[in-house]
Amino acid sequence: MKKVLIGFASIAMAFTLAACGNKTVATTSGGKITQDEYYSSLKNTTSGKQVLQEMIVNKVLEKQYGDKVSKKTVTKQYNSYKDQYGSSFKSILSSNGMTTSSLKTQIRSNLLLKEAVKANDKISNADLKKEWKSYEPKVTVAQILVSKKSTAEDIIKKLNDGGDFTKLAKQYSTDSSTKNKGGKIAAFDDTNSTLDSSFKKAAFKLDEGKYTTTPVKTEYGYQVIKMINKPSKGKMSDHTKELKERIWNADMSDSTTLRSVITKVLKKGNVTIKDKDLKNVLDDYLGSSASSSTK
């Protein structure tokens, strides 16, 4: 969820900018502050200009790709985050100054941007072959998280003595989002950026049905991992969809690619800046000559 949180981080402020008028924002013994005054002050700040950029990009993305992102898709991704973080989900939202509604708004914004990337990224067979070299199918594992190494070692001893992994996960794991599922987590591959790198490295070494024989130290504590499903790689033609997804996901993390895509989207969006003080707000994407021609 971290990428989503940083993606369109100023979305909440956007509503403030959109609601300008002569209404009073605050009153003091020295006088009142109106929305117009607030806007005039805010628009000249870096954060204010960033908000306007994001609002414009969101508007044109919604117009061009809105029909490709359903409410169901947004809800599905939202629920995956909720399941992933379990009981800590609300506190994570709160610490990032977000609500359920604002998170869903950001998820939609990111999905719209991904649709733009997909539409503008022509993937060749050579691209697929290159991606295939490092491709490994998603694996499914179960894990037991504890705070002490000695506890993890005791769990491994119980497994060696024939203990049931699912029962041990429910008994010992401190991960509230997975313990009642026997420690099972969503399938992942090497491109997953939310899992600890030590966790992934240890997991990929396991054969199906095997578990780690020593505790795995991660940023969360100590983990015992069991491989549940490890599909064979198979043929490239069987994984075209997954390969394209990997390429698109990589592009979503590449600033040069995103800048190029957003530039194309904005040019197609017929954007006109009406406020002369903000005429250069899109220079990052359209260049000074394009922005200065707006009225």
From Swiss-Prot:
Domain PpiC: 136-229
Gene3D superfamilies: 3.10.50.40
A cellular component term, taken from the record's GO annotations: plasma membrane
Biological process according to GO: protein folding
Span of the signal peptide: 1-19
Entry annotated with the keyword Signal: yes
Reaction(s) catalysed (UniProt annotation): [protein]-peptidylproline (omega=180) = [protein]-peptidylproline (omega=0)
Protein keywords: Cell membrane, Isomerase, Lipoprotein, Membrane, Palmitate, Rotamase, Signal
Function field: Plays a major role in protein secretion by helping the post-translocational extracellular folding of several secreted proteins.
Record-given protein name: Foldase protein PrsA
Organism field: Pediococcus pentosaceus (strain ATCC 25745 / CCUG 21536 / LMG 10740 / 183-1w)
This protein's encoding gene: prsA
